[in-house]
Amino acid sequence: MIKDKEPRKGQNGGRKSYGSEPPVVCSFCGRTSQEVNSMVAGPRAFICDRCILSSVEILRKEISAIRHPDQSPEPAFQPRLKSPVNIKEALDQYVIGQEQAKKSLAVAVYNHYKRLDAHDWSSGDEVVIEKSNILLIGPTGTGKTLLAQTLANLLEVPFTIADATSLTEAGYVGDDVETILARLLHASDFNLERAERGIIYVDEIDKIARKSANVSITRDVSGEGVQQALLKILEGSVVGVPPKGGRKHPEQQLININTKNILFICGGAFEGLDKIIARRVSKSSMGFGSKVRGKQTGYDPEILKLVTQDDLHDYGLIPEFIGRLPVMSVLEPLDAVALRNILVEPKNALVKQYKRLFEMDGVELEFTDEALERVVAIAIERGTGARALRSVLENVMIDIMFELPTRKDVQKCVITAETIDKTGGPVYEKKDGKERKIA
């Protein structure tokens, strides 16, 4: 017999009262029927769905040990922990520049997963190491998302990206914070143990800053309310998550995820934060005033490196939320040299990707130095950092990649500055040795 968590309705439509009857309690864990999804009743005992799942897992391991006595027991999931130096070296292969940010991330991630190892071996009387979530501050296209993605790949842990602008308070149109955890659960193929040691990157976190410091009669459902909702999962708590995502509803069974070991990396451009810092610094007697006043426009990483928690509070983040992000790192804007290196140097550089695609069609692809310089110049004009590089190249390469697979006589394709500017086509080298420039 199975008892649902809700008491049965009486014939008059009201709830049936237990009266003097004691509540149904699991004989193994002591949870009541109101605390679980379902309860199985025996002649003299009850067992809840959670204890059933735990029992199945225990029996599975025991049966496996009997059938395969020489096989070592299945180890608990452990991320591939590397030293900060090794972590940074791995990041260097994919992320150009941002030396200080990579060092900060390497140390923070190393300490985070070392903390998990310490917790696993803890006897209960050692110092408790708190979780160090990370805040990345930098303009769009500087590599915030790429840094987080590369870290997750390096450690071989589940990873998901959430857009803070899509989050709203529970009860309003939009995603609630549990949706983020549902995505992480999907990324781990519903392996709860892996999900609980994953990494979540929350992008555009600056967009959930309070719209105004003044109290308003209108609810800020995508600002301070979302910050409050994120607090519990940032610090660590057990959250019921709908396995299929979406909003929770009373009839839905939930998967409980403990977030205390999930690493959260939050990133945002924080436009205007440098002005808040500049005003604070200019009021001090440290001689910065004259230096700062001339830098009231544009992105100034040197000013942002002076950021404090008070500055973030003035920007619109609540103190409790700021306190959950103890590690802060400022990313540098990318100059022309860095953008050019991004095109050709990383393991998955855009130029290398296009060369590989052409190679699959039996064609060698080459970019002239002038062509790369034009790509960089156009990207700088657009002002979106490294993100503009792909859009510039894709706009140029789309017609070439459309036509080339049907050109069996071509063995080499050269992209020139004229190709990038669309004042001329690429130079094709045919298999007979002749060259042809497409107008």
UniProtKB/Swiss-Prot annotation:
Domain ClpX-type ZB: 14-67
Gene3D superfamilies: 1.10.8.60, ClpX chaperone, C4-type zinc finger domain, P-loop containing nucleotide triphosphate hydrolases
Domain of life: Bacteria
Chain segments annotated as transmembrane: none
Any one Gene Ontology cellular component term annotated for this protein: HslUV protease complex
Binding positions for Zn(2+) per the UniProt entry: 26, 29, 48, 51
Family that this chain belongs to: Belongs to the ClpX chaperone family.
HAMAP family, A to Z: ClpX
Protein known as: ATP-dependent Clp protease ATP-binding subunit ClpX
Organism listed in the record: Chlorobaculum tepidum (strain ATCC 49652 / DSM 12025 / NBRC 103806 / TLS) (Chlorobium tepidum)
Gene from which this protein is expressed: clpX
